[in-house]
Structures are given as structure tokens and as C-alpha cells.
Design a protein with these regions (language model features):
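Cytosolic ends of transmembrane helices, especially the final helix of ABC transmembrane type-1 domains
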Residues: 1-27
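Signal-transduction coiled-coil helices of two-component systems
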Residues: 14, 31-35
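Extended non-transmembrane interhelical loops and adjacent amphipathic helices
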Residues: 18-29, 49-53, 166
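Conserved E/DxxT/N motif and adjacent residues on the DHp alpha2 helix
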Residues: 26, 33, 154
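Two-component histidine kinase transmitter core
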Residues: 30-31, 109
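ABC-type nucleotide-binding domain
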Residues: 36, 43-211
Length: 211
């Protein structure tokens, strides 16, 4: 390239970078809709009992959501009790409110009516940090970084020991698979976990939660 072409290309790159930075700054400067209430206390988990009581919710101001775009409730006076240690499955058609039900527990949204509690504590009365620290979330579309299996498991806890990583993998029932690999926990997973199957990626994500 000639010096003039280099200058033109640099100016174009600079403009794109500035535009991207402005968009990022707008996102970072946006105050979250969900805030801790005055006097919020830390969540104290004793047994892990979860209670949805007469819960209502609708996406009144959301253009694209899981149903309820026209203001009709996605969740309409729902009661649900989950006992400590109990495993449940929410089954239903697309747009039926399954993902929304899960999103209300860590307060990604607030209920319009009713209440959700953990061990008798309304989730709106506790700090978001303590609430979300107590909840593990594994989404359908798992994102893995182009690093080792061990690094991906320890993503949320960079200082984790090899023993802690191995224990998390054991609890996620993926330890036998990892140990069968020639490089074990040092195996590179590829971009977005391309070298692992969908189920294996899910279990790595579950191990993250346990860690």
C-alpha cells in the first residue's frame, strides 16, 4: 500500500473503532432496570426450598419476548413449590413461559404480582449479588472458549485448584471422558467447543456451575 492508502485505511478503521466504542459506552452507562431495594440483605440458603406463589408476569414493554408481547400474561397466577434436592422439568410448547419462569428466580425480570422465595426469603428483599451467587444457570447454547477443558471449567473461578476442577467434573459426570483423553484436562476444546459434542459441552458448563 502507498502511504496515502495506508492513511485512508487507518482513518476508516479509526471511525469504526470510535463507533463501536460509543455503542459499548452506551451499554455500560445504562442503569439496570432491576435494582436492590433499600435495606436489602444477603440471601441465607439453608435447605434450598423454592416457592412461586400466585406469580404473574407479562412482557408489556418488550418487542420480542417469549409470548405476551401484547400485554397478555406469559405467567398467570402460577403456584410452584420445589422441595430441597428435588429435580423438576418444565415441559410445554414454545412461548409457554418455561424460560421466563427460570429467569424470574435470579431476578432477570421482576414479577408483576405474587412472590418468589428461597427458604422463605422473597428474592426482592435480598441483594442481587447474594441471590445470583446461589444460583447456577446452564443455558441451551453453551459458549466455550478456545482453551483447555480445565480452563473452561474454571472460567468463573480462575484460581481453582486442579483438585477442585476434577471434583466439579466428577459431579457433572464428565470426569471419565476427560480422563480418557490423552491430554486430559489440558485438552484444547477448539473455538466454541467445536471438538466436543453438544452433550459434552453441556456437561463442561454444568461443571462450571458446580465449581
Amino acid at each position: 500500500c502507498t502511504p496515502l492508502e495506508t492513511l485512508v485505511n487507518s482513518a476508516e478503521t479509526y471511525q469504526k473503532a470510535i463507533a463501536g466504542f460509543k455503542r459499548m459506552d452506551e451499554v455500560l452507562s445504562t442503569a439496570p432496570d432491576i435494582q436492590d431495594k433499600p435495606g436489602a440483605v444477603d440471601l441465607r440458603v439453608t435447605t434450598g426450598a423454592v416457592e412461586y406463589r400466585d406469580v404473574c408476569f407479562s412482557y408489556e414493554d418488550v418487542e420480542l419476548g417469549e409470548g405476551g408481547v401484547d400485554g397478555r400474561p406469559v405467567i398467570d397466577h402460577m403456584d410452584l413449590s420445589i422441595k430441597p434436592g428435588q429435580t423438576i422439568a418444565l415441559v410445554g410448547p414454545s412461548g409457554g413461559g418455561k424460560s421466563t419462569t427460570c429467569s424470574l428466580l435470579p431476578r432477570f425480570y421482576d414479577v408483576a404480582d405474587g412472590s418468589i422465595s428461597i427458604d422463605g426469603q422473597d428474592v426482592r428483599d435480598v441483594t442481587q449479588q447474594s441471590l445470583r451467587r446461589a444460583i447456577g444457570l446452564v443455558q441451551q447454547d453453551v459458549y466455550l472458549f478456545d482453551g483447555t477443558i480445565g480452563e473452561n471449567i474454571a472460567y468463573g473461578k480462575p484460581g481453582a485448584t486442579a483438585g477442585e476442577i476434577a471434583e466439579a467434573a466428577r459431579r457433572a459426570n464428565i470426569d471419565a471422558f476427560i480422563e480418557s483423553l490423552p491430554q486430559g484436562y489440558d485438552t484444547i476444546v477448539g473455538e466454541r467447543g467445536s471438538r466436543l459434542s453438544g452433550g459434552q459441552k453441556q456437561r463442561v458448563a454444568i461443571a462450571r456451575v458446580f465449581l
